């Protein structure tokens, strides 16, 4: 080896066909990645909604307890 990278000569038609197949594969990979990200986002959104609901419920309970304790003897 004289330090040069090996060169390969490919028929342009074959090269274009391979590039089209690679583009299709890339589109499928991007689609799957976006679906996975969307599912993760839905799970995170659900968890945040549950936490907000718990906090609001706790605040309402504390307000109820404090208001009801003011009117009892």
Swiss-Prot record:
Membrane topology: Single-pass membrane protein
Catalytic reaction(s) noted: 5-methyl-5,6,7,8-tetrahydromethanopterin + coenzyme M + 2 Na(+)(in) = 5,6,7,8-tetrahydromethanopterin + methyl-coenzyme M + 2 Na(+)(out)
Any one of the GO CC terms: plasma membrane
UniProt gene name: mtrG
GO molecular function, one term: tetrahydromethanopterin S-methyltransferase activity
EC number annotated for this UniProt entry: 7.2.1.4
Keywords: Cell membrane, Membrane, Methanogenesis, Methyltransferase, One-carbon metabolism, Transferase, Translocase, Transmembrane, Transmembrane helix
Pathway note: One-carbon metabolism; methanogenesis from CO(2); methyl-coenzyme M from 5,10-methylene-5,6,7,8-tetrahydromethanopterin: step 2/2
Function field: Part of a complex that catalyzes the formation of methyl-coenzyme M and tetrahydromethanopterin from coenzyme M and methyl-tetrahydromethanopterin. This is an energy-conserving, sodium-ion translocating step.
Predominant place of localization: membrane
Subcellular location: Cell membrane
Official protein name in the record: Tetrahydromethanopterin S-methyltransferase subunit G
GO biological process, one term: one-carbon metabolic process
Ranges annotated as spanning the membrane: 48-68
Family membership noted in the UniProt record: Belongs to the MtrG family.
Assembly behavior: The complex is composed of 8 subunits; MtrA, MtrB, MtrC, MtrD, MtrE, MtrF, MtrG and MtrH.
